């Protein structure tokens, strides 16, 4: 686990992603992908589509299955959960139009005006551009609006390491600015990243 406490800016996310990817690069892992999103973009997309706020968790649980059941499966489950077909179609249309880069973030910035504070989209673009500018390992960083990271305590950017040779995620994290304050009474911004070392070791052993 790596956590940075007390840093309110996106420097924390940039440092965490670079530290983790540099480590993976030193272990000779290549061509993996950092999937990145922001919980506030997730919520803004749900609000724009007309889903009631109290149902967001249900929407995100279903969205999180996108990799397994695809667009049609997500649409079917959302409608079976009682959501209006119009809202479901409006919601999924955005995912079809968003590209996995800063242009996709810009799309969200403009499309979700009135639902999303533009500084959140700008912050995500800064993270992506900064990581691409100074990274030393061979990997891609991709905006993925379907990335949910199940924990509801995340408050901002969230990210995951997707490794093709493993066929899944080998680590992830995000910003959780409210959690420490709930336990200590002292509001402390925080951002963390964890790696599944067992999976990494398994991949290293398989490689040898």
Task: Identify the function of each model-found stretch.
Residues 28-34, 53-57:
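Short secondary-structure capping/junction motifs at helix and strand boundaries
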Residues 51-74, 163-166:
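Acidic, His- and aromatic-enriched active-site or binding-groove loops in soluble protein domains
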Residues 36-49, 64-70:
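Short, conserved secondary-structure transition motifs
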